[in-house]
């Protein structure tokens, strides 16, 4: 089993396949590296594909202190993987919690990024939803500590942005729920309390987003309601970003629509690798509603 060790001594389990420029996949709260199996098989044919389990998700270490978990730490853990594999730069691909970590990696370690793919990112970010989200994160952490993972998975797997997977792919949804139930209750609770609840709102990061210059893809499902407006916010403020929306899809787009997801991400990476990824033309930003040149 392969592990990278962070600067605070936490071991992160990872798997890799293929060769070429590294692509590091960063999983969501309700998933782990197994969630990226469709991507590991697909992108491992062309790239050095790497997926790892975040701290708190066995077989990675599970620190028992909430202070060991934070949004900054999640971004720095990606760097620990990158340093361990001996690569200078990598394409970083994240979903949900992993999408937030990918964005923050781009902010904190932009010089180490070949590109950023930020998926399903934004829930709880809107100013009028911020305190509601913090309260829900605290409630989830308490529920995990009290009732454990199996009971939690039975509720969380049927949320409003998860039923799309159930309707399209009942077997895939059952597998998603089974893997979620196998997670560490302590690690998941600490992740909710330390990372999710305490992370800054995207609306507080606008100036930081404006400084991102590496090629960026923002991707979300059109029924992932909490992530749609934040996706537009990121598109507006990252000049090197494109926004892709997968129709009739919820939150876990990489397992819900793996072929479409792989196609979109694959086209993005190919453009980046060829040096053809565009930056927004400043003339595209106008105060004109009708489209007249100022």
Regions found by a protein language model. Name each.
Residues 72-90:
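Conserved acidic catalytic loop of the alpha/beta-hydrolase fold
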Residues 94, 98, 102:
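Gly/Ala-rich beta-loop-alpha elbow adjacent to hydrolase catalytic centers
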């Amino acid at each position: 089993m392969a592990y990278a060790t962070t600067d605070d001594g936490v071991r992160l389990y990872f798997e890799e396949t293929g060769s070429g420029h590294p692509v590091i996949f960063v999983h969501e709260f309700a998933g782990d590296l197994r969630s990226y199996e469709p991507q590991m098989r697909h992108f491992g044919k062309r790239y050095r594909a790497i997926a790892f389990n975040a701290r708190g998700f066995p077989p990675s270490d599970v620190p028992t202190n909430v202070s060991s978990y934070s949004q900054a730490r999640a971004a720095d853990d990606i760097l620990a993987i990158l340093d361990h594999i001996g690569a200078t730069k990598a394409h970083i691909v994240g979903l949900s919690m992993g999408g937030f970590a990918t964005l923050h990696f781009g902010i904190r370690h932009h010089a180490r990024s070949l590109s950023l793919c930020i998926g399903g990112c934004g829930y709880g970010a809107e100013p009028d939803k911020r305190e509601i989200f913090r309260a829900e994160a605290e409630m989830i952490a308490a529920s995990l500590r009290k009732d454990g993972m199996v009971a939690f998975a039975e509720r969380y797997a049927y949320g409003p942005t998860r039923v799309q997977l159930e309707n399209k792919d009942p077997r895939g949804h059952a597998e998603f729920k089974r893997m979620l139930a196998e997670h560490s209750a302590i690690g998941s609770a600490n992740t909710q309390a330390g990372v999710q609840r305490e992370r800054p709102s995207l609306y507080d990061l606008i100036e930081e987003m404006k400084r991102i210059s590496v090629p960026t893809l923002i991707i979300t499902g059109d029924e992932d309601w909490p992530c749609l407006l934040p996706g537009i916010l990121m598109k507006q403020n990252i000049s090197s970003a494109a926004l892709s929306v997968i129709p009739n899809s919820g939150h876990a787009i990489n397992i819900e629509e793996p072929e479409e997801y792989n196609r979109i991400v694959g086209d993005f990476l190919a453009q980046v690798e060829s040096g053809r990824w565009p930056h927004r033309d400043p003339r595209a930003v106008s105060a004109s509603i009708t489209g007249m040149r100022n």
